C-alpha cells in the first residue's frame, strides 16, 4: 500500500491506487462473502475450483477492460456507442439494472453486519449505513474521501479475514485437490461467484475511476497496467483467504448455528460469541465499500444519458444510495438470498460488456489511438468471454432455485 501524508497530516491516497482499491473492495464485497460461505458449506473443497476460475476470469476481464478504456480515455458506455449505435444505452441499461439489485444486496449486507456487530434490526442497520454512505458524498473533496474510506475499511476487512484463516487452520491440501478435481460442482455457483466479483458494475469501477483521475492514453499504459494488477492481486488474495477461512470451519465438521447465515455462523464457530461481532464488522465494512463503489460507478454510466446526473453527479450518487436503502427496508428480502441473486444477475450482464471491449481491441484500433493490441491478451479475453457467455446461458433456467 502506497500512501503519503500531506501537510494536514491526513491520509492521502494516489488516484491510481484509489482506482485499484475501488475495484478490489467492490469485488470482495458482502456478495462474495455470502456466496463463499454458502457454497463452501454445500460443496466443500470442490468450491475452490469456482474461486480459482473466478480469479482467472477476473484477470482476463480486468486487464482488457482497464487497457481498452484507459487508452481510449472513454467510459464503457461512450465507447460502446461509437462501436454500435445504441450499444451504449443497452449496456448502461443492463449495468444499471444489475447495479440497483446489487446495491440493495449491499445495503442488506450492511444491515446484517450491524445486526451482528451491535444487535440492531437489519433494517435499522441498513438505514444507518445508508446515511453514513450519503455523508461521504456530501464532503467537498468527494473522491479523496472515497479513497480514504476504501483504505481504512479495506484494512479492517483484510485483517479480520486473515485472523479467521489463522484461527481455523484450513487443510490447504484438500482445497488444492478440490481445485483440480471438483466433484459435484454445477455451473450456477461458478456463474454466481463471477457475477458477484467480476460482473456488472464491478467490471468498470476501477477503469472509470482511472478515467476520472485523468490517467489515460498510451503514454500512461504502464500506470494503467500497474493499477489493474494491483486491484486484481488484492481482490484475489481476499478471495483465497476468505475461502480458506470458511473451508477451515467446514473441514472440522463444526455445527453451524444458523444455516441461513453461513458466514456469521462460521465466525461464531471459529471465535465463539465474539466471532459474531467480528463478522459483523467484516460484513459491514464489505457492504459499505461496495455501496460506495456501486453507486459511484452506476452514476458514471448514467451521466452520459441523464443530464441532471452529469450536472449534479454527487447528488445523483446520493439518490442511488437512498433508493437502494428504501427498497431494502420496504421489501424485507432476506439479505443472503438477495446478495446471491444479485451476483447471478451480474454474471448474465458480464458477456455483453466484455464483447464490446474485445470488439474494440479486435476491429476498432482507431478508438485506441492506433494501439497494436497484444494478441495474447486478446486471446485470453476471448476465452473468458466464451466461458462467461456459455455459463450465463446454461444457468438462465437455474436462477429461480436460489430462492427455493
Residue ranges: model-predicted function:
Residues 129, 138-168, 181-184, 342-350, ...:
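Membrane-interface loop-to-helix entry segments
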Residues 1-34, 189-192, 216-230:
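Membrane-interface "cap" regions at the ends of multi-pass membrane proteins
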Residues 155-181, 190-208, 354-368, 391-403:
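Hydrophobic alpha-helical segments and their helix-loop junctions in multi-pass secondary transporters
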Residues 92-93, 117-139, 155-165, 307-330, ...:
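Transmembrane alpha-helical segments of multi-pass small-molecule transport proteins
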Residues 71, 88-119, 126-130, 284-304, ...:
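Hydrophobic transmembrane alpha-helices that form the core helical bundles
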Residues 2-3, 36-38, 63-87, 114, ...:
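Flexible loop linkers connecting adjacent transmembrane helices
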Residues 23, 50-83, 90-98, 246:
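Juxtamembrane transmembrane-helix boundary signature
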Residues 49-64, 157, 225-250, 388:
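Selective recognition of specific alpha-helical transmembrane segments in multi-pass small-molecule
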Amino acid at each position: 500500500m502506497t500512501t503519503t501524508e500531506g501537510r494536514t497530516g491526513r491520509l492521502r491516497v494516489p488516484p491510481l491506487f484509489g482506482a485499484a482499491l475501488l475495484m478490489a473492495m467492490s469485488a470482495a464485497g458482502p456478495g462474495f462473502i455470502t456466496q463463499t460461505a454458502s457454497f463452501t458449506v454445500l460443496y466443500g473443497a470442490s468450491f475452490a475450483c469456482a474461486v480459482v476460475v473466478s480469479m482467472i476470469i477476473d484477470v482476463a476481464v480486468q486487464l482488457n477492460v482497464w487497457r481498452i478504456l484507459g487508452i481510449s480515455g472513454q467510459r464503457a458506455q461512450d465507447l460502446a456507442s461509437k462501436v454500435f449505435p445504441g450499444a451504449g444505452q443497452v449496456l448502461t441499461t443492463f449495468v444499471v439494472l444489475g447495479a440497483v439489485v446489487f446495491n440493495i444486496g449491499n445495503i442488506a449486507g450492511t444491515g446484517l453486519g450491524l445486526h451482528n456487530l451491535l444487535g440492531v434490526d437489519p433494517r435499522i442497520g441498513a438505514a444507518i449505513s445508508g446515511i453514513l454512505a450519503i455523508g461521504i458524498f456530501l464532503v467537498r473533496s468527494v473522491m479523496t474521501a472515497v479513497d480514504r474510506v476504501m483504505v481504512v475499511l479495506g484494512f479492517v476487512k483484510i485483517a479480520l479475514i486473515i485472523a479467521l484463516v489463522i484461527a481455523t487452520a484450513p487443510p490447504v491440501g484438500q482445497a488444492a485437490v478440490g481445485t483440480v478435481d471438483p466433484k459435484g460442482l454445477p455451473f450456477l455457483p461458478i456463474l454466481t461467484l463471477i457475477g458477484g466479483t467480476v460482473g456488472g458494475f464491478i467490471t468498470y469501477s476501477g477503469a472509470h475511476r482511472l478515467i476520472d483521475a485523468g490517467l489515460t492514453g498510451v503514454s500512461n499504459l504502464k500506470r494503467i497496467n500497474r493499477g489493474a494488477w494491483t486491484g486484481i492481486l488484492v481482490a484475489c488474495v481476499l478471495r483465497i483467504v476468505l475461502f480458506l477461512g470458511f473451508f477451515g470451519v467446514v473441514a472440522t465438521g463444526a455445527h453451524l448455528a444458523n444455516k441461513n447465515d453461513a458466514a456469521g455462523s462460521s465466525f461464531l464457530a471459529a471465535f465463539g460469541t465474539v466471532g459474531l461481532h467480528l463478522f459483523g464488522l467484516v460484513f459491514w465494512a464489505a457492504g459499505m465499500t461496495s455501496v460506495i463503489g456501486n453507486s459511484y460507478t452506476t452514476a458514471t454510466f448514467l451521466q452520459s444519458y441523464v443530464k441532471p446526473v452529469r450536472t449534479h453527479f454527487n447528488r445523483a450518487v446520493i439518490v442511488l444510495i437512498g433508493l437502494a436503502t428504501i427498497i431494502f427496508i420496504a421489501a424485507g428480502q432476506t439479505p443472503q438470498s438477495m446478495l446471491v441473486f444479485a451476483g447471478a444477475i451480474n454474471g448474465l450482464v458480464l458477456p455483453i460488456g466484455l464483447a464490446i471491449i474485445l470488439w474494440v481491441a479486435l476491429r476498432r484500433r482507431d478508438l485506441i489511438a492506433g494501439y497494436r493490441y497484444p494478441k495474447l491478451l486478446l486471446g485470453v479475453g476471448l476465452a473468458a468471454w466464451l466461458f462467461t457467455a456459455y455459463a450465463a446461458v446454461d444457468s438462465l433456467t437455474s436462477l429461480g432455485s436460489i430462492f427455493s
